[in-house]
Amino acid sequence: MGIDTGTTATPRTLAEKVWDDHVVVSGGANEPDLIYIDLHLVHEVTSPQAFDGLRLAGRPVRRPDLTLATEDHNVPTVDIDKPIADPVSRTQVETLRRNCAEFGVRLYPMGDAEQGIVHVVGPQLGLTQPGMTVVCGDSHTSTHGAFGALAMGIGTSEVEHVLATQTLPLRPFKTMAVNVDGELPAGVTAKDIILALIAKIGTGGGQGHVIEYRGSAIESLSMEGRMTVCNMSIEAGARAGMIAPDDTTYEFLRDRPHAPKGAQWDAAMRYWQQLRTDPGAVFDTEVYLDAASLSPFVTWGTNPGQGVPLAAAVPDPELMTDDAERQAAEKALAYMDLRPGTPMRDIAVDAVFVGSCTNGRIEDLRVVADVLRGRKVAPGVRMLVVPGSMRVRAQAEAEGLGEVFTAAGAEWRQAGCSMCLGMNPDQLAPGERCAATSNRNFEGRQGKGGRTHLVSPAVAAATAVRGTLSAPADLD
């Protein structure tokens, strides 16, 4: 990758700079560009057929040193020393282990101190760095864009292509700027920003775009908060999300196991500091949010765009002027068993899930512990707190957070994707309602017939205590 000297005639966006630095072969006007990939992350669900393709063709993994695998989607978060009960999940995990051993790919299996959700593991090890291209057979690869990387999910055939060549044929994306300026009110978090954005532009609003998040409110976020925002770019329909690196980024990366050291750090910093959108660069689309007007947000329906402030009520489909929107709302309310006009704070839950690649990091767990400390989970509510990685779990234990969770009556688990999706034992029963810090509230996402409300960690913790959708301020 070269250093942008600022002499380019046409001002470029951050996404365009990273793209240009990774073009191996230009496709011109009619063909895709061939893009070099700096980091390829792999898990057990989308990789088996890709490795099979390599095996059939007699090809090795081109750059095993730039490839990292971890077990996350299918793994249990209790009794991890026992065999996985579900035969499909067990087969996928065992297949990943055999493939990584055969092709020389690093793997962090269950029980390893570095195992966890792939989008938590990469950043915490310092593997994800500004200006990189990052891919994974997982839609929420956009998480890594918080570092100023161009990161996107890919399909299994593309996973095979990257394993074989360390490149990917891609057509340039459109660009969108999401400007969030002003000071966030107390109790409003990164999760509330992204839920409010998706409610504003819809789940298709970012289709075909790479979103760059900008403005003073974004700059004020920690790296954990930035990862939350970029993680859910996909729920807005975008291909990727990015935030320009700054001092917050550099301090997070400094001294991480795989971060550059010494002279290499200095050289990397010279490149990283060029990774900003040029003055005068033009975005295809621009969106504005006033940070001061935001409040804790929660979804009421079955897609992430069906959300309202916690202080609001379940919307009335009859008041919606768009036919498709009205029909979708009616269908969602029927599935969610909600009535228009019901205050969101009156909605009782059966379960609370804290975790996922959206909100399973140490900062998220600290927020939850602050709310739970000295309090109890409401009777009849089951609360799961699942760290995004074993490293996060170890840090939480060192800070005494695990004791806070268990004293409150929550279940303190091992690392994994857990109740974010119904691919492991952590699932809702039909008809159960859950406040979840994850990223998707589709029908059956957390288990057949389960009903999901997407919330921030702060709202999740307060909800667990009150038993109804709540913010920490409601506990005072």
Curated annotation (Swiss-Prot):
Cofactor: [4Fe-4S] cluster
GO biological process: L-leucine biosynthetic process
InterPro entries cross-referenced by the UniProt entry: 3-IsopropMal_deHydase_lsu, Acnase/IPM_dHydase_lsu_aba_1/3, Acoase/IPM_deHydtase_lsu_aba, Aconitase_4Fe-4S_BS, Aconitase_4Fe-4S_dom, IPM_dehydratase_rel_enz, IPMI_cat
Cofactor stoichiometry and binding remark: Binds 1 [4Fe-4S] cluster per subunit.
EC number: 4.2.1.33
Quaternary context: Heterodimer of LeuC and LeuD.
Assigned protein family: Belongs to the aconitase/IPM isomerase family. LeuC type 1 subfamily.
Role of this protein: Catalyzes the isomerization between 2-isopropylmalate and 3-isopropylmalate, via the formation of 2-isopropylmaleate.
Protein name per Swiss-Prot or TrEMBL: 3-isopropylmalate dehydratase large subunit
Organism: Mycolicibacterium paratuberculosis (strain ATCC BAA-968 / K-10)
Lineage per the UniProt record: Bacteria, Bacillati, Actinomycetota, Actinomycetes, Mycobacteriales
Gene: leuC
